[in-house]
């Protein structure tokens, strides 16, 4: 059973029942819907499709809304694409909307002139063209073109190592989040999170619109987010290492080191972490990945990522089904080489010694020493399963829960396989029901030895305090 979770973006290349079915059968744990593109009607149709197929296949697939976030873009150019020459002067006009040409353009963020100073770098279209700030004249930013390249209408603008005073949540984001609450999504991947207050602002909108149970995965995409990573992790349900904008905002050679650092910090506190962007980028165009891409996926898993993600590969690429099946094969092969004893020893060193952690660690240690077929967790809120997952056991973690929403909240937790059950009564009923459900689902067989972890009393969340070893009958 694959332990690494997978999140695939559903888009124009994959919005059919046949392809979504193939995605779920390949192991999709969450569908991602990118609100940087498309309108509510378009996304509503795709969300409805995923809900239909997951019900048909009886799989607890989560639905993730990815916000557009506070991005900066160029205005219109005439012609819509043109070349800037290295060494030429170029002016960014902040005070008004103008039609751009080879000497000037306007941008969507009108206060840029307040944030930058001479010597700063401005990057256009994922860094394809660099501008060096020479002077600020009124609301105009006077630049020199650092390299010859193409610019065009509505291209992304990045300003590395500059704290941009954009609001963390735009009006569009707020509208999209409210739409997500109505659609009963399970998680938000929040773009361009720079500080914990950004996460709390999103949480406030969700709470005010019936989305209290929606998880927030903060996307770390710039230096400010990296600098505030500990505080951001604390207020987030999980983290996404969003390597696209990160690779523009931060020197590219530092991205792998930051990825490892963020994964390690999330592992230490037991919060899920997703590694994303360009994992199989060449499969947008080709039916087979590059060797480097295969290594990238495997190494993210060896680093300790809970989940891996496809963006354009599954949303807009020419080979969406091949991309998802390739990702699954690479993940499964990598998992065969994981040193689970080493993972467990490392987690033990990070132990905070509260009751839930001690019982969960004991559960994983017992499962390893006894070579148990599975760890079965009975959980009302998902807390027990998440804490056990933190210790990366070799045995699969079967999370038995009476809540469909909780089952989907576990979509990004490494190694956790949720099963829906009836509500639990007594402690004995909780244990027997959980084991029976795991047997019924085919995760264990009669005669298997399993380790059961749960919280008693059953109706109190976050109280993992019981461990039992038993043989399946």
Curated annotation (Swiss-Prot):
K(+) binds at residues 34, 36, 66-67. Keywords: ATP-binding, Glycolysis, Kinase, Magnesium, Metal-binding, Nucleotide-binding, Potassium, Pyruvate, Transferase. Pathway: Carbohydrate degradation; glycolysis; pyruvate from D-glyceraldehyde 3-phosphate: step 5/5. The record marks 219 as: Transition state stabilizer. It comes from the Bacteria. InterPro entries: Pyr_Knase, Pyrv/PenolPyrv_kinase-like_dom, Pyrv_kinase-like_dom_sf, Pyrv_Knase-like_insert_dom_sf, Pyrv_Knase_brl, Pyrv_Knase_C, Pyrv_Knase_C_sf, Pyrv_Knase_insert_dom_sf. The keyword Endoplasmic reticulum does not apply. Its EC number is 2.7.1.40. Mg(2+) binds at residues 221, 245. Homotetramer. This is Pyruvate kinase.
């Amino acid at each position: 059973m694959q332990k690494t979770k997978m999140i695939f973006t559903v888009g124009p290349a994959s919005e059919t029942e046949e392809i979504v079915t193939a995605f779920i059968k390949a192991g999709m744990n969450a569908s991602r819907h990118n609100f940087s593109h498309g309108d509510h009607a378009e996304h509503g149709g795709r969300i409805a499709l995923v809900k239909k197929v997951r019900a048909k296949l009886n799989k607890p697939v989560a639905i993730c809304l990815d916000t557009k976030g506070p991005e900066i873009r160029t205005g219109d150019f005439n012609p819509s694409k043109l070349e800037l020459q290295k060494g030429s002067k170029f002016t960014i006009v902040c005070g008004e909307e103008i039609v751009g040409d080879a000497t000037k353009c306007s941008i969507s963020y009108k206060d840029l002139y307040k944030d930058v100073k001479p010597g700063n770098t401005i990057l256009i279209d994922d860094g394809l063209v660099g501008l060096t700030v020479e002077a600020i004249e009124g609301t105009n930013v006077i630049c020199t073109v650092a390299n010859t390249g193409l610019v065009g209408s509505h291209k992304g603008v990045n300003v590395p190592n500059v704290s941009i005073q954009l609001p963390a949540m735009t009006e569009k984001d707020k509208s999209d989040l409210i739409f997500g609450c109505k659609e009963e999504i399970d998680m938000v991947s929040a773009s361009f999170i720079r500080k914990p207050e950004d996460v709390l602002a999103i949480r406030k909108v969700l709470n005010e619109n019936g989305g209290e149970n929606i998880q927030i995965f903060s996307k770390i995409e710039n230096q400010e987010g990296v600098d505030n990573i500990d505080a951001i992790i604390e207020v987030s349900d999980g983290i996404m290492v969003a390597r696209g904008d990160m690779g523009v905002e931060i020197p590219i050679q530092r991205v792998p080191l930051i990825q490892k650092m963020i994964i390690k910090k999330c592992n230490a506190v037991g919060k899920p972490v997703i590694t994303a962007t360009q994992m199989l980028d060449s499969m947008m165009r080709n039916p087979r990945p590059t060797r480097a891409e295969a290594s990238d996926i495997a190494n993210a898993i060896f680093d300790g990522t809970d989940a891996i993600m496809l963006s354009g590969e599954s949303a807009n690429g020419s080979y969406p089904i091949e991309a998802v099946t390739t990702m699954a094969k690479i993940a499964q092969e990598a998992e065969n080489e994981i040193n689970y004893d080493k993972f467990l020893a490392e987690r033990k060193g990070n132990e905070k010694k509260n009751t839930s952690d001690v019982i969960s660690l004991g559960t994983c240690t017992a499962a390893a020493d006894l070579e148990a077929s599975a760890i079965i967790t009975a959980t009302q809120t998902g807390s027990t399963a998440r804490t056990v997952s933190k210790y990366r056991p070799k045995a699969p973690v079967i999370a038995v829960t009476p809540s469909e929403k909780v089952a989907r909240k576990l979509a990004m937790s490494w190694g956790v396989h949720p099963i829906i059950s009836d509500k639990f009564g007594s402690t004995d009923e909780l244990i027997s029901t959980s084991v029976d459900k795991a047997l019924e689902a085919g995760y264990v067989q009669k005669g298997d030895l399993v380790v059961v972890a749960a919280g008693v009393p059953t109706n109190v969340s976050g109280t993992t305090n019981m461990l039992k070893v038993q043989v399946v009958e």
